[in-house]
Amino acid sequence: MTRTAPNRPPGWLNADSGDFETFRQIVSQTADPADTPLASAVVRNIPIYDGAQVDAAALHPARRQALMQEWAHVFAHGAGILVIKRGVADHSVIDRASSVFDQIIADEKRAAKGGGDHFAKPGANDRIWNSLEKHCLADPANFAAYYSAHGIALASEAWLGPAYQMTAQVNRVNPGGAAQTPHRDYHLGFMSGARMAQFPAHIHAVSPTLTLQGAVAHCDMPVETGPTMLLPFSQQFFEGYLAFSRPEFQAHFAAHYVQLPLQKGDLVFFNPAVMHGAGTNHTTDRFRMVNLLQVSSAFGRAMETVNRTRMVRALYPVLRATAGLNVENVIAATAEGYPFPTNLDSNPPVGGMAPKTQADYLRQALSAGQPEAEFFLTLEALDQKNKS
């Protein structure tokens, strides 16, 4: 009896994975307003919610749960994007935060440590890495008023569940600042294509569930100022992390992306697998400031704390002296092989999307036969760079 092999999806993807026609059909969908009954409108396939109604729903458990359920469906199975109008209704809170951010940008420029951008050309914008902590330390009262917004909390919990981890980065796009390259985002979106392809296919489905992207508008943003370009439904295309850099996908994005004008205090949230990028600021006199929220699942962490630096120091002489070991396997069990979280002010990416890891430095030291004392100084310097 001949057995038929099961029709299984591929265990790994590659640079050619993903059918363009399938992608085109997915992003050609039209949103059905019946799927988002709590939205006040649907504009260009993106559901729009009223901030006052969100605040009211947050105070009633059943309404809160219904809203989060609707949002979870939008992020996973709908457009992947939602807007909360007047999510931070008190403009004095936004204005004070903007003043804090302007001062931080000025101070960091004077110190020559202003943040670069992973997807934009140098000079197009000003960045504040870790604006969350810097904002909190500069003005704790304003920080508390800012992050007390129900829309931020409900969107984060709708996608990630409780105990999420908030991070934030300010992006101020300068007059004439060019658009970002359209992309997917953290985690897999911060890797080279070759590195992405090393992760099994099911991880390409997991990555979007570990992060939520958000933005707080700090000024009015007509389309000419370059609000975020978004491609609704694109998070539904499974192979997108590897496929979206191909020319036909980039061309389709350029012809079909959506930009919605925003007002000060509006909130935008989207699945990190949505193809997106900051738009070109076509104005000559308007600085477009947003605070980008990158919220992470509590599940993106190991169960135990491990002092990997101490382990690497102990193992380094063994790895140098012992023959017959499968060194890569030992490195994988010991050294920190992932570059995040890190301090992007003191440990910025050089020649790529992410900084070098402890495992990278260990491999490099072993290959070069680096003396212990010299390598240990490298480890100590890396630990210092990673601190906030």
Residue ranges and their predicted role:
Residues M1-A76, A333-P341, D345, P349-S388:
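Fe(II)/2-oxoglutarate
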Residues D95, P227, Y241-L242, T280-H282, ...:
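Short conserved micro-motifs at the rims of enzyme active sites and ligand-binding pockets
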Residues D90-S92, N174-G176, P222-E224, F237-F238, ...:
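Flexible loop/turn segments at secondary-structure boundaries
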Residues L154-A155, Q180, L188-A251, Y257, ...:
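Catalytic core of non-heme Fe(II) oxygenases with the double-stranded beta-helix
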Residues L242-V318:
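Catalytic core of Fe(II)/2-oxoglutarate
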Residues F233-A243, T283-L292, A373-S388:
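C-terminal/domain-terminus segments
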Residues I81, Q165, A179, T209-A215, ...:
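Extracellular structured ligand-interaction cores
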Residues V27-G193:
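Non-heme Fe(II)-dependent double-stranded beta-helix
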